[in-house]
Amino acid sequence: SYIKLFLDTFEKQLHCEVQILRTTTDSPSKYEIDEMIHSADLIYLGGGNYIHMFTQWKEHRLDEKLLLALQQGTLIAGYSAGAMCWFTSSIRSDYEGSGYIESNGWGIVNKRFCPHYNQLNRMNAFHSFLQNHQGNIEGIALEDNCALYITEESFEIIGEPEKAWEFYMSDKTLIRQHFDITLKSYL
């Protein structure tokens, strides 16, 4: 399973102490949630159903707790749906198999985001979304096995730079280009 793979990687290979917070199958107390988040050096938000995750986070006030942890310097990583929350909005599956729709995020990063950009249908949907959006819009798209490291001042790519894209509008034309700032991946 996804969690077993995560544990194998972080506990066995990287020798990290790992705690898993599940709000759907477990019923952690407010104290347990606060303690887990407060004691973490790194918080990893996994992928999955974005709307379900967002609902669960609000119910347990995880959105507020994660934003506070970020402000206090905790490193927070996200994959797919776990990355989408940080952006103004993202493109995601409609979960009915008929297409892609926009979902709002927390707006910490004032750009639109597309994970799994290597999937042709998702790529085309993201292009259409950006082109049809009113006003000045900027976007970021990442193919699988590529990460974006965000600080207050910069964006840096971890992985292959040809898998990371940035978008902006110029004279009503969508411009797509690769990021030019890269960190060498040690994974």
Region spans (language model):
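Short, active-site-adjacent cap segments at secondary-structure transitions
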Residues: 50-51, 83-85, 147-149
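General beta-strand structural signal in soluble alpha/beta enzymes
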Residues: 20-22, 44-45, 77-79, 139-141
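C-terminal and late-domain segments of enzyme folds
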Residues: 1-12, 90-92, 96-187
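N-terminal beta1-alpha1 cap of cysteine-dependent amidohydrolase-like domains
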Residues: 1-42, 46, 175, 183-187
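Catalytic-core regions built around general acid/base machinery
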Residues: 35-39, 60-73
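Glycine/threonine-rich flexible loop motifs
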Residues: 50-60
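Catalytic nucleophile loop
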Residues: 44-47, 70-89
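Short amphipathic alpha-helical segments and helix-helix/interface helices
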Residues: 7, 33-34, 63-67, 126-130
